């Protein structure tokens, strides 16, 4: 590409302060340095995690910032020493990097590379950024920042994918789908013929249902107070749909009545800390497994769970990004989609452009949208 080695001026959505609308700005994207990759972004999903953090003061010291992390694009150029991708490759952004060398990368039971530390700084280039706007250094959300026409990332945060992959579809595999599907396949290890319940029917919750179905679950109960989501849940594999508000008794008692003694596997995907106890209580007392999927409402929240729920054999565990070793396994998920092993198309309900990013945010907040994709 004729842009190699040059600063690229392009458009991006910039968050100047928490709670403010995203601003469409011209930014400058410098060439990649050693072990870095510059990417022409093509599509990005708008994730619930982006929405949650837009209005929180947690990001105030990192503004200006480019939000977004669920993205795909084409490699424009690479820095010295990059070997896993080259110019022209289709790539997917990795919400958790995989260096392949640290203690956790070498542990088969762990998917949290120590280089995830970069996400806390929101800087993709070891203490700095290759992106500026109006003379200011621009941070990149969790060291990615996909709401931009171009970005620069570390090689360990990028993976090559199938050259035939439809980027406007597979972008959501990078976070939302991988998180939910993997929670069922890897974290819970759902078994054939089992019973499952899924609390929360957003994009991640529906992806859990797809995972439960793929694992051979016999009964999958979708739980949400938004009945508009029930048809979509049935489309992707739910056998039953329940609104807790339709009953006078607690949801755990409702599910225990539906499935004698409780379900084998329950997934809490609402992010509501108060729902964790109900999800655990919905599991069979002797062998039920409850998985909290993704981030709860706040990292400082305290769980209040009745101790008797642990008296027998129930298990409560967490799951982050579905337990996938990202650089190795996220591309395989893209290939599995191409091979029609599962269908993510029903999860994408809206497709907009970068200039419509604020409309996408409002759609997600309103509950009218499962997953919105921005074309860049």
UniProtKB/Swiss-Prot annotation:
Cofactor note: Binds 2 Zn(2+) ions per subunit.
Residues the record lists as binding Zn(2+) 2: 99, 102, 105, 113
Entry keyword annotation includes Iron-sulfur: no
Residues where Zn(2+) 1 binds: 47, 69, 175
Record organism: Rattus norvegicus (Rat)
Protein name according to UniProt: Alcohol dehydrogenase 6
Listed GO MF terms: alcohol dehydrogenase (NAD+) activity; all-trans-retinol dehydrogenase (NAD+) activity; zinc ion binding
Reaction it catalyzes: a primary alcohol + NAD(+) = an aldehyde + NADH + H(+); a secondary alcohol + NAD(+) = a ketone + NADH + H(+)
Subunit relationships: Dimer.
Domain of life: Eukaryota
Gene Ontology process terms (BP): retinoic acid metabolic process; retinol metabolic process
Cofactor(s) demanded: Zn(2+)
Gene3D superfamilies found in the cross-reference section: Medium-chain alcohol dehydrogenases, catalytic domain, NAD(P)-binding Rossmann-like Domain
Localization annotation: Cytoplasm
Gene Ontology CC terms, in alphabetical order: cytosol
CDD domains cross-referenced by the UniProt entry: alcohol_DH_class_I_II_IV
Protein EC: 1.1.1.1
């Amino acid at each position: 590409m004729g842009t190699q080695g040059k600063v690229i001026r392009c458009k991006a959505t910039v968050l100047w302060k928490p709670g403010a609308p995203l601003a469409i700005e011209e930014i400058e994207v410098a060439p990649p340095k050693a072990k870095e990759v510059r990417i022409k972004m093509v599509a990005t999903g708008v994730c619930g995690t982006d929405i949650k953090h837009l209005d929180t003061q947690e990001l105030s010291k990192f503004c200006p910032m480019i939000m977004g992390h669920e993205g795909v694009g084409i490699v424009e150029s690479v820095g010295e020493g990059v070997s896993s991708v080259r110019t022209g490759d289709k790539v997917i952004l990795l919400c958790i990097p995989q260096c392949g060398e640290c203690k956790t990368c070498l542990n088969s039971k762990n998917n949290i590379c120590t280089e995830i530390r970069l996400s806390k700084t929101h800087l993709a280039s070891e203490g700095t950024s290759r992106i500026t706007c109006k003379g200011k250094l621009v941070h990149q959300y969790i060291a990615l920042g996909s709401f931009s026409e171009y970005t620069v990332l570390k090689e360990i945060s990028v993976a090559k994918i199938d050259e035939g992959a439809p980027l406007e579809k597979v972008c959501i595999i990078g976070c939302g789908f991988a998180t939910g599907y993997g929670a069922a396949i890897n974290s819970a290890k759902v078994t054939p013929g089992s019973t499952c319940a899924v609390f929360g029917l957003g994009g991640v919750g529906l992806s859990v249902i797809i995972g439960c179905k793929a694992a051979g679950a016999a009964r999958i109960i979708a739980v949400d107070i938004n009945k508009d989501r029930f048809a979509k849940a049935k489309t992707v594999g739910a056998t039953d749909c329940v609104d807790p508000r339709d009953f006078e008794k607690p949801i755990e008692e409702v599910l225990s009545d539906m499935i004698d003694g409780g379900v084998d596997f329950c997934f809490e995907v609402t992010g509501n800390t108060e729902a964790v106890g109900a999800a655990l209580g919905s599991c069979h007392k002797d062998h039920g497994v409850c998985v909290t999927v993704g981030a709860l409402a706040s990292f400082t929240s305290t769980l209040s769970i009745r101790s008797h729920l642990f008296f027998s054999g129930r298990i409560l565990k967490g799951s982050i990004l579905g337990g996938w070793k990202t650089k190795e396994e996220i591309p395989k998920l893209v290939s599995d989609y191409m091979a029609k092993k599962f269908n993510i198309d029903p999860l994408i309900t809206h497709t907009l452009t970068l200039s419509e990013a604020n409309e996408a945010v409002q759609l997600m907040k309103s509950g009218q949208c499962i997953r919105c994709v921005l074309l860049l």
